[in-house]
């Protein structure tokens, strides 16, 4: 009787956990993000960080030249003393993923808060990659637990977690490649324009960060076309989405 009661109790607990699996996944992902952000202050300045920030400022200076009126002048003043990216030796180095950091930096105002904000911003990009991996595995397996396990494996890798706070090249391109794959799968499965647009945008940022990001854009595009041919679904709408 006791053994039967114990089995029933364990079964009830497992069923209760399964029913709350999505909530548990959300809580775990939030805790992962919170822990990562909480320890950001423990990471120092990366070797290339000053150069990357200089490239970002040069990009902003370049854009200010094409914005008319007071807004363009205001942006140009903020980037005073910085050469335009078109005149820089670093003009082939992209940093599109960090355009949003320009607004975050204004809130931070001064050092050391700007460096801290830069590292937190970088970690947020890493977490977007973790979420994208969760989404990819969920699409492929339809399992919350397998998706969460895959996300934790990436997150708990010491190298990935650590560099997720300051590596603004390799970690960023990895994150946006994962995002590209996720939206590419969503586009292929659901055939909606919004996923095609998000897929293209994520691929553009990945490619801007490192040219290797273009490979995944091309591979997914070719895979989508092959799928349409195999399923004999080469309609105008499906082709236009791709």
Summary of predicted features, one role per range:
Residues 150-155, 162, 182, 203, ...:
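Short helix- or helix-capping micro-motifs
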Residues 120-141, 179-183:
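Transmembrane-helix motifs of polytopic, lipid-linked glycan transferases
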Residues 172-189, 195-203:
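Specific aromatic-rich, kink-prone transmembrane helix
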